[in-house]
Amino acid sequence: MLKEAIQYLVSLKENKTYQLNGEIYSDRELVRVAPHVDRPGEVRVNGLDSIVKLVSHELDMLENLPVYIRVVSPRQVEVFSTLDSVMGRDDLYVAVCDAPDFAAGKWMPHENAIIALRSAFVPNEGTEYLLDLLSRISKEDGVTTEDNGVSQTVSARQGIALKRFEQVRQRIALRPYRTFTEVEQPESEFILRLNEDAEIALIEADGGRWKMDSKAAVAAYFEEKLAGEIQDGRVVVMM
């Protein structure tokens, strides 16, 4: 009796297959055990120059070539290897831009707008115009804004007022810091809005074109810095 029980328990460990109507069935689910593969840990940095140095110094240590540099967004770059023998990739490096991201489209108090224009934008004619405009806005008992969708005028009545009546430019070319500082910040147009609380808003008006321009600039940076590695086929840059 004990012998039969032991034999029964042993039989439970066996995987049995059955053929029914030309198909093979198993009486238990099989789970594939993937082979262990040593892979490097992903390195996170904040600059494009760091990616160039890592690729230049460690490329000869890698077996699975080429290495792909993918510009994911204006603020992120990923580097990974090609497929290996078990169809896996090594995630090597990630660069994430740590420059402050300008909050386009949000209302900013008068003082905050001045600080943002001086710290979060590359100086150009557009920032000069806005700083001059804001310097001539004063608190009053009230204000009236007239807006026909094309232009806006501000006059004193309640909230804020320009020290003299004038028409405000609606579309202004600006270059906020929106991508890695190693490349030129893209210029794009913004729509300027003013309200009765002395707040301003800058709304992107280029349909997101600046994102493609930024990614192209980042890709061009790598193509210049890693020209030799790209030419011999060990590095591929893509967007």
Model-predicted regions and their roles:
Residues 1-78, 232-239:
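An N-terminally focused, membrane-permeabilizing/fusogenic/translocator signature enriched
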Residues 2, 23-26, 37-44, 48, ...:
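Intrinsic-disorder-associated interaction segments
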Residues 12-15, 40, 54-61, 65, ...:
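Surface-exposed polar/charged interaction patches
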